[in-house]
Design a protein with these regions (language model features):
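Peripheral, non-catalytic segments flanking oxidoreductase cores
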Residues: 1-317
Length: 317
């Protein structure tokens, strides 16, 4: 009908053996879909069936066990980088709590984390399953990175340098159900400081993403299969792509009386984020100067916390 308003919807992309096979026509067309989704929305839902149901359920079980630990135990999970260790008891976000494993997917760091949480416990099952799960999510994240680079014609030149600088943060997240008089906002609106985030969640509450024109898209996990992952681009990805990729403002909204559990794998670059010269031309002049990813994280935790647009303030041209 003329004049009908079409509400924006989260793009859904199925990732299969066929379209993940590099060089095929299906791979190239899916690469274009992913690029368009990230440029327009900064996020997409990926249907990905290679994570065994039993492993996924075990991981959410581990998350529940972790958050039942005493606060003094969880506080042992520390890191110099804000957001990489334990977070909770936030005045502005009373429902949210998280625990992070730096170098998520690596055996040594996972063992260290498990021994902190359960110093007298049997941590073998937790470690084996967490490493296996993290590696599976890292594999699909790697496949998506390759496809984005392919879509920009940058795969051969930039894949290895980017991948060599990658490190992952594995995070367990809990949003408890709100009490009668409490806010229903699990996580305040924010943009990610990671390069990319891959989020897996149980079927509770909503994840909402804001579009470029200020509208909110709602992802209701209860209406999707358990094989659905959410990819969310972070601000450093926006900078690297010279503004092409959108980093969306997003938030978590709670409903009902169940707790929400999520698993997230965030990618960070150990070195410099730099716009490829191929993405700079007369029509697309350089928007961002080169910067060190972890120095940017420190800035966001200090002076940048006062800025409306910390990325522009820190490295905008």
């Amino acid at each position: 009908m003329a004049g009908e308003v079409v509400e924006p919807k989260l793009p859904i992309i199925e990732l299969t053996d066929e379209n993940l096979m590099a060089g095929t026509s299906s791979w190239k067309s899916t690469s274009g879909e992913i690029r368009r989704a990230l440029e327009e929305y900064g996020c997409f839902a990926a249907v990905y069936k290679k994570v065994p149901t039993e492993l996924r359920e075990a991981m959410f079980g581990h998350g529940k066990e972790l958050f039942q630990l005493p606060l003094e135990t969880k506080l042992q999970n520390t890191c110099d980088v804000l957001g990489f260790g334990y977070g909770g008891k936030f005045l502005s976000m009373p429902l949210a709590e998280y625990l992070g494993i730096e170098n998520g997917g690596a055996v040594d760091s996972t063992n260290k984390f498990a021994n902190q949480m359960w110093p007298n416990g049997n941590t073998q099952k937790f470690c084996e399953e967490t490493v296996s799960y993290s590696k599976l999510i890292a594999e699909v994240d790697d496949a998506v990175l390759r496809m984005i680079l392919e879509s920009y014609g940058l795969l051969e030149k930039y894949y290895e340098p980017l991948k060599d600088s990658y490190m992952y943060l594995m995070r367990f997240i809990k949003y408890r159900s709100p009490k009668m008089d409490e806010t229903k906002i699990g996580h305040l609106p924010h943009k990610d400081r990671s390069f990319m985030g891959v989020i897996d969640t149980n079927q509770v509450g909503f994840l909402e993403m804001q579009t470029r024109d200020g509208k909110w898209i709602t992802f209701d996990p209860s209406t999707y299969t358990n094989s659905t992952l959410i990819f969310v681009a972070g601000e450093p990805f926006t900078a690297w792509s010279n503004g092409r990729v959108y980093a969306p403002l997003h938030r978590v909204i709670m409903k009902g009386d169940e707790d929400k559990y999520s698993l997230a794998l965030f990618s960070f670059m150990r070195g410099i984020v730099e716009v490829p010269e191929e993405l700079i031309d007369e029509e697309n002049p350089q928007q961002f100067k080169s910067f060190h990813h972890f120095q940017y994280l420190k800035y966001c935790a200090t002076d940048g916390s006062k800025e409306k647009d910390p990325l522009k303030a820190y490295c905008g041209v």
